[in-house]
Every structure is written in structure tokens, then in C-alpha cells.
């Protein structure tokens, strides 16, 4: 017998949960179908950064700020701790400082330039050696990615009656009917597929024709740092400036990109830039790298670890690197 809903959502990560929330708050009946007992994909493996500073001015930044508002609402609901931590982009090279100063002068997002002393007051994890300045933005938030998805799913079930069906693998979609591997059937007027890379299993031909490529990120986690090395603010390095679209309008970025391509082309090859987020328990998430398409393997590359650590040590200072 089919279970009938207004909306069926495949995937219990942040994207699926967001669609479930928006549908449920409009009064629609919603079923959330997740193939594992709890979300285990990108939603739980990342920094826990809510990062409006990375989005370019216009529609995308407006969407990011709207997302920020919803995360704050989750915090007010007591679902999880949502910290208004902000972010600091560090400059250890002259070309990095030039980009930050140009970005500050653009009529885009409100930011504040910090002296090295001001940076270290807010961010003891910043490496003072060669530090030229920092750029502070107050729009970024921090959540714990390990617990966020599970907490939100529980809240959606309790507050809105969202039917969260875990350990439910959808193997086929035919029209508005979804078939689970265990024989259960679901029917919905609208179906939203948010299963991450699992979309290849449901729509392999569409993925092939779309030209989309998978992206594998790699990051590391350091153990809890001592009390004197605790901070709330997110950190990003000069390498990050070439990664996010918000900085692409800075004419000074070209010199930075050229210098990196000449000095350290291996960083471009693996899409490496450097960021840090410290969780409330003192652990530090560090990263990250980006591999695309056919370059992706199920194995971690020691070379990537070594390159990331090399760059991380230039801009961050941890009391314990274990």
C-alpha cells in the first residue's frame, strides 16, 4: 500500500532538511527518505561554517543571508548551538593584503580591516609570523556539523510532523511514485532529490548528459586545543581568496593567482586552500582540498595531507597538532 504525501524528499542532509522545513511550514505533508540511519555525507563531514562572505553580491549573497536567518532561527529554537562568530581572512603576503583592502573598498559586504595585534586578540590560532593584517566579517555562523542534521530531523518530526524514514533506500522513481529497496512505496505530488552523489544511482543518464562532475573534499581535524588557544571566529587564508566568487571582482586578485600558479602550482592541481573552524569542544577542523570527476578515488592521498599541512602551518598556530 502506497504512503501518500504532498512532498517526498530523498536525502537527509542539510539540503534535504531545508526543503522539508520549507514545505512543512507551508502546511504540506512531507516524508524525508534517508538511506542510512543518520545523514553521513557532506553535511556531517564539513567545517560547520555558514559562509555568506564567500558569495558574490546580488542574488547569491541574498540567498546566503536568508540561509543565515534560518540557521539563527534553529539556534533560537534550541535545536543546537548556533554561534555568531564571524570570520577573519588573514594576509601573510602583500598581494593578499591588496585583495582584502580592495574588497573592503568595494560597496559590497561590510567588513573591517584589522591590524596584526587586533587579529591575534580575536584569533589566537592565527600565526603571527609574517602576519600583515586581517579582514573581519560579522556575517558568518558556526554550527557543529556532526550533530546538526540529526537534531534538525528530530525537530522537524516533532514540530511539523515530517515523516522521517531512515534506513530507506529509494531504488526507483516512476512518475510520482517512489519505490524503496525493501518493498515500500511512496506517492507524492512533488519529489525532491537531495541525495548528493547518490543521484547517480537514480538518474545516471541525466548526470552523464548534464556535464556535472563529482567533487571530493578532504579535510583534517586536530584534537581539542588548550583553553588559551580557544576562539570562536572562523579563519581563512590568502589562498581562500581565489576560491570564493565574492573576491573575483577584485582586480588585484590576478596578481595573487599568478603568484600561486608560479610558486605552488600543486595547490591549484588539488584545489587546496586553507581554512579553520574550531568547535565548542576545542577541536579544530582544517582544510581543504578539491578533486573533481575522474581524479576522485576512494583513497586519501598522502600528498594532499602533506601539502595542506605545509600551508596550514604557514598561517595557523596550534598548540597541539595531533
Predicted region positions:
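Flavin-binding catalytic cores
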Residues: 222-230, 253-322
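Dinucleotide-binding Rossmann-like beta1-alpha1 core, especially the glycine-rich loop
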Residues: 47-122
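N-terminal Rossmann-like FAD-binding beta1-loop-alpha1 element of flavoenzymes
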Residues: 5-31
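Glycine-rich FAD pyrophosphate-binding loop
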Residues: 25-44
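Glycine-rich, N-terminal phosphate-binding loop of Rossmann-like dinucleotide-binding domains
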Residues: 12, 54, 92, 195-196
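Helical element adjacent to the flavin cofactor pocket in flavoenzyme catalytic cores
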Residues: 136-176, 186-190
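Short beta-strand to alpha-helix junction loop
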Residues: 62-63, 90-98, 135-154, 299-304
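Flavin-dependent oxidoreductases
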Residues: 173, 184-277
